Each structure stands twice: as structure tokens, then as C-alpha cells.
């Protein structure tokens, strides 16, 4: 069996050399990333046996990570794996080795903030590959990135030292926000880092269904929302698109902790942002409204139900269907899911526009029948039809019969042409 000192020699004794490709890691970088992954397993599974080596390995990994340029994609896996190892140490019995003020300051300055920076390849995905960007940024994907590992490192450090970590790291949040305020158009990336850092400091527990469920008591989420998030929503479209997306994502994350009286201002702003020419912003705006409509009170009643939603219903439909009509968003699952959610929550308050809504849905079905698209999008289209019929049946069964007449020819065509098997 290969000994632990052997691995140490491989980490500390080899010069960091990348491959010829500037974007992809060479063999040596891959090996070092794998070694860091193995070290993480040692710390997690065999902490007692590994205890004599933790200090040396931690120093070796630290030296390795801090001389890497995190802006280069080829180092992403190594940075992520290395920070995972430090995260595991921060959670275990050796956590005191990372708890000193100087250590925390160095970690924040040299690892966390640099690895939370918006990189060139992030900008490319944001503009040219929005699906990939959203999958990595908004959804609970299993993608391992240096940015996600930096956030996990912050959360790991909080486990045994929450008050001190929060105090030290929060000072950097303030510095970043002050830098942004001095020149928003040029320093937008500083606020982007601040958004990610405050989230890593604040979130203590979360679920996919509810978003954040518990928070760090030392982080004033309400104050940050009012001072830094709501102001960005109101500044649209005169602020940077990445900051627009960050603000909407923050609301998605902390939706269960926001009071009902904040929802109208959020929804009003988000409706406008659905029309953004930037696909990520339009998608986040739709996701923001949709997820707010899923928030429940302790008694399971909706925090923002049909009556509260009514003033916004038709503006939401106008914005969502209008954006779906554009070629770049015609198969956007977030917009379609929003339409489905509003139909479900509105409880029949769409009667006056129901025929127009059904016409829009039928037109979409006719289009996707010819060229099936994203499965989730197709699913939400048919769910929307079902919601519309269901919510109106008790009020006007004759209207549902009209809907059947509108949609049956299309459905018959699907069966006759055996579209599903093509």
C-alpha cells in the first residue's frame, strides 16, 4: 500500500506545470487534483490515523493553491479539490489550525475572494451559453467548480467558529460593496463577489423546495435585501446584467425568509426584467416570480396567494408570452413554468383572458409537435393547459368545452402522426 508520505512528496515536491492547452488541465494538474481528492477522503474517513500529517499536507495544499491563477479554467478542478480538502479539515478535530484571525484573513484574501471572481469563461457562458451558466449558478447541480468550493470552504470554517468567521469575512463584503458603489459600471464584479460571499456566510440550511430555511444569526439578511438587492431591482435596466441576475438569484435563495409585504415590489420589478434581452436575466426573473409563488406559511397557506397576485396576473402573462415569442427564448422552461404556476395559483382569476391564453398555448403546442424541444418545457406547456381547464371548469364548463374544441385537432394530429415516437 502506498504510504501517506509518498503522497506528500507528490504534492510538495513537483513543480506546478500545466499542459500546453490554456483551457484544459494537463496530466500533472489532473494528478494533483486527484491527490487532493484522496487527501480529502483520508481526512474524512481516517482522521485519527491521518492526524500526524494534516499540518504538513495543509501547508502543501495551501502553497499549491495560492500560486495558481484562478482566472484560468485549466486550474478549476485542482482549486476545487484543494479547497475541498481544506473544508474537510475546517469541519474536523484539526479545525483550530484554520481558526486564527491571520489564517482566516489569508484564506479570504488569497483563496475565497479570488475564486469567487467572475471569470472570462463565466462571461462567455453568461452571454453565449446561458443554459450552461444557469445550470451551474442557479440550479442545485453537482458541478464542482472553484467558486462552489470557495463557498463550501466559508461554510466549513463557520462550523466551529461562526462569529469570528462572520466578523472577518463580513468586513470584506463591506469593502467590496464600497468599491462597487464608487464606480458601479466598472466595479460590478466586486458586488458579484459580495453576493456570493454573503450567501456563503448566511446560509445554514436549505432545501430545493423552500430555498434557504435557516441562516447565520450574525448576518442581517433583511438589511442586505433592502439596501443591496431591492435597490438593484429598481435600478434596472441601468445596472450590469450580472448584478441583475445576482439580485434575482438572492431572492430565489432567501425567498422563504422574505416578508409578504416585500413580494409586490419584487414581482413588479421582475416582470419588467422578463423582457430583458439577456437570456439569463429573463430566465432568473421568471424563476424568481415562480418560486415566490411556491412559498408557504407555517399553516401551509400561500404567502402570496390568488388575491395578492391578481393585480400582476396579466402583466406577467404579457411579459412571459412576449418573451417566449422571441427566437432566443421560445423554448425557455423557466418562462413556461412561470405561466403554469400563475395559472395554478390564480384560481380562476384569468377568465377574462382565458381564450387568449389558450390560443397562445395551442400555438406553442403546434410548434413543439413539429420539433420536440426540451422535455421540461414540453411538460410545463401541457401542465399549463391542464391548470387552465381545471381552474375554470367550476366557473364556466362551457368555456372548457371551447378549449377542447381548440386543442383537440392538434392532439388528434399528434396521435395520427405518432409524433412521440419520432
Roles of regions detected by a PLM:
Residues 1-422:
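Karyopherin-beta/Importin-beta family HEAT-repeat alpha-solenoid scaffold
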Amino acid at each position: 500500500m502506498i504510504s501517506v508520505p509518498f503522497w506528500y512528496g507528490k504534492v510538495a515536491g513537483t513543480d506546478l506545470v500545466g499542459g500546453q492547452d490554456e483551457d484544459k488541465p494537463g496530466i500533472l494538474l489532473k494528478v494533483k487534483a486527484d491527490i487532493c481528492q484522496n487527501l480529502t477522503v483520508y481526512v474524512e474517513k481516517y482522521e485519527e490515523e491521518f492526524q500526524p500529517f494534516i499540518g504538513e499536507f495543509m501547508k502543501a495544499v495551501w502553497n499549491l493553491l495560492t500560486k495558481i491563477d484562478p482566472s484560468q479554467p485549466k486550474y478549476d478542478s485542482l482549486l476545487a479539490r484543494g479547497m475541498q480538502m481544506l473544508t474537510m479539515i475546517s469541519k474536523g478535530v484539526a479545525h483550530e489550525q484554520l481558526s486564527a484571525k491571520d489564517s482566516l484573513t489569508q484564506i479570504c484574501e488569497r483563496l475565497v475572494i479570488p475564486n469567487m471572481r467572475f471569470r472570462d469563461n463565466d462571461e462567455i457562458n453568461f452571454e453565449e451559453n446561458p443554459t450552461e451558466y444557469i445550470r451551474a449558478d442557479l440550479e442545485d447541480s453537482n458541478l464542482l467548480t472553484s467558486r462552489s468550493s470557495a463557498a463550501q470552504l466559508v461554510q466549513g470554517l463557520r462550523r466551529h467558529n461562526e462569529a469570528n468567521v462572520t466578523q472577518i469575512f463580513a468586513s470584506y463584503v463591506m469593502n467590496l460593496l464600497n468599491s462597487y458603489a464608487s464606480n458601479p459600471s466598472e466595479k460590478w464584479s466586486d458586488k458579484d463577489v459580495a453576493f456570493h460571499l454573503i450567501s456563503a456566510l448566511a446560509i445554514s440550511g436549505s432545501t430545493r423546495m423552500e430555498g434557504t430555511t435557516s441562516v447565520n444569526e450574525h448576518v442581517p439578511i433583511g438589511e442586505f435585501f433592502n439596501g443591496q438587492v431591492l435597490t438593484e431591482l429598481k435600478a434596472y435596466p441601468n445596472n450590469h446584467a450580472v448584478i441583475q441576475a445576482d439580485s434575482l438569484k438572492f431572492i430565489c435563495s432567501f425567498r422563504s425568509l422574505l416578508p409578504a409585504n416585500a413580494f409586490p415590489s419584487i414581482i413588479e420589478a421582475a416582470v419588467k426584467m422578463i423582457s430583458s434581452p439577456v437570456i439569463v436575466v429573463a430566465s432568473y426573473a421568471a424563476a424568481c416570480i415562480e418560486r415566490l409563488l411556491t412559498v408557504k406559511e407555517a399553516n401551509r397557506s400561500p404567502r402570496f396567494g390568488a388575491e395578492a397576485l391578481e393585480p400582476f396576473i396579466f402583466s406577467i402573462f404579457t411579459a412571459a408570452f412576449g418573451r417566449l415569442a422571441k427566437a432566443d427564448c421560445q423554448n425557455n422552461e423557466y418562462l413556461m413554468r412561470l405561466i403554469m404556476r400563475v395559472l395554478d395559483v390564480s384560481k380562476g382569476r384569468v377568465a377574462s383572458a382565458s381564450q387568449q391564453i389558450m390560443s397562445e398555448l395551442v400555438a406553442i403546442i403546434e410548434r413543439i409537435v413539429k420539433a420536440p424541444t426540451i422535455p421540461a418545457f414540453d411538460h410545463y406547456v401541457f401542465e399549463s393547459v391542464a391548470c387552465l381547464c381545471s381552474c375554470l371548469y367550476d366557473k364556466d364548463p362551457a368555456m372548457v368545452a371551447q378549449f377542447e374544441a381548440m386543442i383537440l385537432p392538434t392532439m388528434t394530429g399528434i396521435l395520427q402522426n405518432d409524433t412521440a415516437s419520432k
